[in-house]
């Protein structure tokens, strides 16, 4: 998660850069060591259209991610100038706290407790830039993320842990990640056409976000579109979860429980939850698989006991005849009256008579002239 927040804050820092340049830098950061080294070399040789501050910041980010990248004199001079007013005792204290922080959250809590000034933050950045091998990747990522967050904070108003631009960039990243997992989910939910349509929408939205990310006018529209796509992705993910519970309950219980089956379930659950963009960790996925497995076993036992009870009631206690009579009465409630009518019709045909009157009604008194007589 720390790496994703770093990417989001980096993208937020580059919101005023040309979309093609921003895409190239983010792709290099997420593309591995070789891609990042190539991008750092391009930045150092000023082959990318970046301003001086943007170029040095991106080089610092890339070197802290991959210490194999050689330092750039321009970035080192900028850091030395920013920390020139800091006392040596403060620098030693900061370095001790950084090594004791342990991880990304430790760096965050450290900065919040100390309420660091700009020169103190720059001292941390200078440490991870000049001596990256002395610190763990979590410390380096946490330091750079906090630094970028402070830089983004100066250009906008926000009160959350992630800057507003960083939060939007994080949502865009989640939409991109969801679009890559939709194809895997389509096979589980049986919604191939809907999944294909949703994937096209997410890809179009990602392209739109890439070109209009730095625009304050387009931000509300982008967030509304992202929210709509996230809702549909979440709905498909929930549907896939329901399908998975059914599959696990009725297919895995017919096979002996083994580690192979559990790993298969874990893979399905991880692929499914990638659509809702909140991936299970291994423990949660394992426990959820065991819960579904237990639910399937209980369901099978209940059905088996129910079938045995019904067989005993039918063969031993002779209740099936009564059930058949109840079913017959329920399906054809007027069968008795129909049999009586058929018998009466046959009797009349045999006697050759018309149907007798069922009520004793005397004829109406009319005269020969058709006048009613009282």
From Swiss-Prot:
Sites where a glycan is attached: 270, 281
Residues bearing a lipid moiety (S-palmitoyl cysteine): 324
UniProt topological domain (Cytoplasmic) ranges: 1-238, 310-374
Transmembrane segments: 239-259, 289-309
Residues recorded with modification Phosphoserine: 337, 362
Residues under site feature: Cleavage: 259-260
Single GO cellular component term: host cell plasma membrane
PTM comment text: Palmitoylated.
Extracellular topological domain: 260-288
InterPro entries in the record: CM1, CM2
Keyword S-adenosyl-L-methionine among UniProt keywords: no
Highest taxon above the source species: Viruses
Segments forming a coiled coil: none
GO molecular function: channel activity; structural constituent of virion
Keyword entries, A-Z: Disulfide bond, Glycoprotein, Host cell membrane, Host endoplasmic reticulum, Host membrane, Ion channel, Ion transport, Lipoprotein, Membrane, Palmitate, Phosphoprotein, Signal-anchor, Transmembrane, Transmembrane helix, Transport, Viral ion channel, Viral matrix protein, Virion
Subunit structure, interactors included: Homodimer; disulfide-linked. Homotetramer; disulfide-linked.
Family: Belongs to the influenza C protein M1 family.
Function per UniProt: Ion channel, which might have a role in genome packaging and uncoating processes.
The name this protein goes by in its record: Polyprotein p42
Gene: M
């Amino acid at each position: 998660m720390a790496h994703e927040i770093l990417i989001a804050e980096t993208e937020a820092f580059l919101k005023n850069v040309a979309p093609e340049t921003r895409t190239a830098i983010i792709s290099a950061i997420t593309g591995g060591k070789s891609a990042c080294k190539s991008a750092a070399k391009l930045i150092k040789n000023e082959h990318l259209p970046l301003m001086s501050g943007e170029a040095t910041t991106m080089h610092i980010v890339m070197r802290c991610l991959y210490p194999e990248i050689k330092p750039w004199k321009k970035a080192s001079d900028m850091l030395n100038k920013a920390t020139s007013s800091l006392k040596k005792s403060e620098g030693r204290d900061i370095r001790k706290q950084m090594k004791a922080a342990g991880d990304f959250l430790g760096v965050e809590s450290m900065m919040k407790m100390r309420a660091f000034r700009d020169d103190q933050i720059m001292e941390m950045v200078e440490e991870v830039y000049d001596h990256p091998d002395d610190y763990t990747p979590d410390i380096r990522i946490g330091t750079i993320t906090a630094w970028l967050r402070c830089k983004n904070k100066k250009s906008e108003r926000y009160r959350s842990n992630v800057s507003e631009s960083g939060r939007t960039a994080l949502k865009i990243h989640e939409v991109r990640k969801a679009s890559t997992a939709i194809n895997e989910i389509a096979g589980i939910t049986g919604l191939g056409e809907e999944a294909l349509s949703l994937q096209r929408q997410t890809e179009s939205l990602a392209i739109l976000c890439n070109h209009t990310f730095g625009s304050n006018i387009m931000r509300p529209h982008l967030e509304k579109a992202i929210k709509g796509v996230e809702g549909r992705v979440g709905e498909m993910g929930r549907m896939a979860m329901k399908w998975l519970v059914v599959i696990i309950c009725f297919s895995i219980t017919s096979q002996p429980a083994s580690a192979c089956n559990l790993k298969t379930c874990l893979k399905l659950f991880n692929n499914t939850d990638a659509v809702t963009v909140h991936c299970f960790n291994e423990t949660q996925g394992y426990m959820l698989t065991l819960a579904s497995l237990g639910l399937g076993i209980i369901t099978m036992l209940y059905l088996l006991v129910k079938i045995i009870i019904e067989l005993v009631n039918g063969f031993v206690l002779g209740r099936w005849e009564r059930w058949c009579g109840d079913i017959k009465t329920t399906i054809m409630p007027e069968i008795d009256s129909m049999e009586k009518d058929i018998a009466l019709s046959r009797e009349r045909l045999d006697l050759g008579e018309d149907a007798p009157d069922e009520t004793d009604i005397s004829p109406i008194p009319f005269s020969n002239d058709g006048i009613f007589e009282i």
